[in-house]
Curated annotation (Swiss-Prot):
Residues 103-115 have a biased composition (Gly residues). Residues 92-101 have a biased composition (Basic residues). Residues 1-67 form a transit peptide. Its main location: plastid. The modification N-acetylthreonine is found at residue 68. One of its GO terms (biological process) is translation. It comes from Arabidopsis thaliana. This is Large ribosomal subunit protein uL15c. NCBIfam families: rplO_bact (TIGR01071).
């Protein structure tokens, strides 16, 4: 006679209660409704799943967030460049329009040039500056011949230095003030185009010592102040402009002619008082 199977009156007591909690989400699951398995395969699988998730949680890379980026909602860990993740930036490679490939492509029938008109025909198109028949802008404006002052208008012609800067530069009594000595003192540091410019002394400030100045130009105020303080002023000659030999010959002849004319006028002016006496 077969022995009857004994069944428990409370089936819930023979079941194991499992709770699932994923660290990456806020989901909590209850698997208490699952029946017990004598082989305990389910419990082993659940334990392995929990272990792997814990290992993944602790194996995440440490990311340091600055105070300015603390308000950002998500922090993306840096990723190494590999051949499988290289690609252009989004939006940098725009898809080319396929013109003349049917109306479904968007530029099929007239290719974006419209139905009729000069702009839809072949050829050079309209002229530059055309405004549809009205007087064009280049015809409405007056014609200006050249540039006022020439192409070099507004560019500096001298390296200016004031008297007050020379006073505080550390010069001693009787020293020479020139372009080279001012460079050594650090008052000027020309670069580029300014390296070819001459020196000009300006009259802002006062000077309490006697110095020797060598410059291309002096302002009116600077000249008066320096002469009053007993300084020696030397005006350096400018760089001669190159001219053709024929032009130089004509200029020399003109200078000689006007020199003779001035000498004759001076001689006549001196002889008139003697004749009247």
């Amino acid at each position: 006679m077969a022995t009857p199977l004994s069944i428990s009156s409370n089936p819930l007591t023979s079941r194991h209660c499992y709770r699932l909690h994923l660290s990456s989400t806020s989901f909590k699951g209850n698997v208490s409704v699952l029946g017990a398995n004598p082989s305990q395969i389910l419990s082993l699988k659940l334990n392995q799943t929990l272990k792997t998730r814990n290992q993944q949680q602790f194996a995440r890379p440490l990311v340091v967030v600055s105070q300015t980026a603390a308000t950002s909602s998500a922090v993306v860990a840096p990723e190494r460049f590999r051949l499988d993740n290289l690609g252009p930036q989004p939006g940098s490679r725009k898809k080319q329009k396929r013109k003349g490939r049917g109306i479904s492509a968007g530029q099929g029938a007239s290719c974006g040039f419209g139905m009729r008109g000069q702009k839809s025909r072949s050829g050079p198109g309209i002229m530059r500056g055309f405004e549809g028949g009205q007087t064009a802008l280049y015809r409405r404006l007056p014609k200006l011949r050249g540039i006022a002052g020439g192409m070099r208008s507004g560019l500096p012609k001298y390296l200016p230095v004031n008297i007050k800067d020379i006073e505080t530069a550390g010069f001693q009594e009787g020293d020479e003030v020139s372009l080279e000595t001012l460079k050594q003192k650090g008052l000027i540091n020309p670069s580029g185009r300014e390296r070819k410019l001459p020196l000009k002394i300006l009259g802002t400030g006062e000077l309490s010592m006697k110095l020797t100045f060598k410059a291309r130009a002096f302002s009116t105020q600077a000249k008066e102040k320096l002469e009053a303080s007993g300084c020696t002023l030397t005006v350096l000659p400018g760089r001669k402009k190159w001219v053709k030999p024929s032009v130089a010959k004509n200029q020399a002849r003109a200078d000689e002619y006007f020199a003779k004319k001035r000498a004759a006028a001076a001689e006549a002016a001196t002889s008139e008082p003697a004749a009247s006496a």
